Curated annotation (Swiss-Prot):
PROSITE patterns per record: AA_TRNA_LIGASE_I (PS00178)
Signal peptide interval: none
UniProt-recorded name of the protein: Glutamate--tRNA ligase
Organism: Serratia proteamaculans (strain 568)
TM helices/strands, residue ranges: none
Subcellular locations according to the entry: Cytoplasm
């Protein structure tokens, strides 16, 4: 059996984490089986679909590196195909025209609600012999079976059954001639030879209707797998207040795509007790049967932990590629300073996100005229003048600018003055970084560079002289 899956978002908003997880699961299932993955944009809602949303979906998929074999297909470009199938169904009598007015349908709905019944179409036009002309307003409905049931073996939830008596005759073409979502999906899955439909559990009620239409068309019925929803850590449906933002917001906030993918794959799927998965491991181990039926809770702290792990365990060169985007957003020019891969190595332990890292690395590239007020008040006091002058002299005398020689200069200054490293290191840290926190002084001073470090020490000495005056 040829495995072929699809991700079919509606472009009415950003690609959120739930959609991204569904895309990932569909992608992994196809890649695990050596199959194909299709991207399809379900843009039949003409009023709500936007180009911005389409761009956001594409950006999110590309950032996550979820590549596709076919597409992107757009449903709005396939209306002729859908309508041709509907016209065929009218001829085959598996669909019929419904001329019921909005007023009649609304009255029917109100009466059913009053009687405690489930609102559904009563089939008034299903077998009507009333004469109507084609130019009268009408919709086209699918002639759903009235007996029996629809049973499908959900690959996550097991067998699910719906009585056909609970399913009314679905509208498949609107009054304006446009086909409806549920019908377009069926024709697309048929034409694109989709073998497995992996989607959110909110589509479970659509499945029996779509299966009945597929059977009426004589089309093969794909396998279905419905993924549970994602909850916030308070047990409620995930929303913006939980951080349910678009995927690209996670990029903007400094998360690596590898970390987000690792987090999303574990949000409902497991392989033993393993927490960290490379993309290759995900593809090797992923099965639909290992997806949990129950809802999963989104935990930002866990995502941050994973991101910190990836920052420190991925090759620094790869992390630096993503860091470059954040540095650019801050307008930091990196030509006259250390390579970004070295920044990753220097700041990786301290920073949980790349955004934090970009904000923290500015002093490696940009000079400053003022020091952090609290740090300067505490460490750039008159008593710090002698250690700074002494360490400056040793740093200026270095001919081979290496971290080891920088370390020896700082340690040698402390030894000669008979003071602890902190008496030299803390004033030096504030002098060269402008603040009270940084990685180790030897690697920090080395990365900043000899001339720039000496100039900043001179600025600090001038600051101290001002306090002495």
């Amino acid at each position: 059996m040829k495995i072929k899956t699809r991700f079919a978002p509606s472009p009415t908003g950003y690609l959120h984490v739930g959609g991204a997880r569904t895309a990932l699961y569909s992608w992994l299932f196809s890649r695990h089986a050596g199959g194909e993955f299709v991207l399809r944009i379900e843009d039949t809602d003409l009023e709500r679909s936007t180009q911005d949303a389409i761009d956001a979906i594409m950006d999110g998929m590309n950032w996550l590196n979820l590549d596709w074999n076919e597409g992107p297909y757009f449903q709005t470009k396939r209306f002729d195909r859908y309508n041709a199938v509907i016209d065929d169904m009218l001829v085959q009598d598996t669909a019929y025209k419904c001329y019921c007015s909005k007023e009649r349908l609304e009255a029917l709905r109100e009466k059913q609600m009053e009687n405690g019944e489930k609102p559904r179409y009563d089939g008034h036009c299903r077998d009507s012999q009333c004469s109507h002309t084609d130019d009268e307003p009408h919709v086209v409905r699918f002639r759903n079976p009235q007996e029996g049931s629809v049973i499908f073996d959900d690959k996550i939830r097991g067998p699910i059954e719906f009585s056909n008596q609970e399913l009314d005759d679905l509208i498949i073409r609107r009054t304006d001639g446009s086909p409806t979502y549920n019908f377009c999906v069926v024709v697309d899955d048929w034409d694109m030879e989709i073998s497995h439909v992996i989607r959110g559990e909110d589509h479970i009620n659509n499945t029996p209707r779509q299966i009945n239409i597929l059977k009426a068309l004589g089309a093969p019925v794909p396998e279905y797998a419905h993924v549970s929803m994602i909850l916030g850590d308070d047990g409620k449906k995930l929303s913006k207040r939980h951080g349910a933002v678009g995927v690209m917001q996670y990029r903007d906030d400094g998360y690596l795509p590898q970390a987000l993918l690792n987090y999303l794959v574990r949000l409902g799927w497991s392989h033993g007790d393993q927490e960290i998965f490379s993309i290759d491991e995900m593809k090797e181990f992923f099965t639909l049967e290992a997806i949990n039926k129950s809802a999963s809770a989104f935990n930002t702290e866990k995502l941050q932990w994973l991101n910190h792990h990836y920052i420190n365990h991925m090759p620094a060169e790869e992390v630096a590629v993503h860091l470059a985007w954040h540095v650019e957003q801050l307008g930091i020019e990196t030509r006259n300073g250390p390579e970004l891969k070295d920044i990753v190595k220097l700041l990786g332990e301290r920073c949980k996100t790349l955004k934090e890292m970009a904000e923290s690395c500015r002093y490696f590239y940009e000079d400053f005229s003022e020091f952090d007020a609290d740090a300067a008040k505490k460490h750039l006091r008159p008593v710090a003048r002698q250690p700074l002058e002494a360490v400056r002299a040793k740093l200026a005398a270095i001919t081979a600018w290496t971290p080891e020689n920088v370390h020896d200069a700082i340690q040698g200054t402390a030894d000669e003055l008979g003071v602890g490293m902190g008496k030299v290191g803390m004033p030096l840290r504030v002098a060269v970084t402008g603040a009270g926190q940084s990685p180790g002084m030897d690697v920090t001073v080395h990365a900043i560079g000899q001339n720039r470090s000496l100039q900043r020490i001179d600025l600090a000495l001038a600051y101290i002289a001002g306090r002495e005056a």
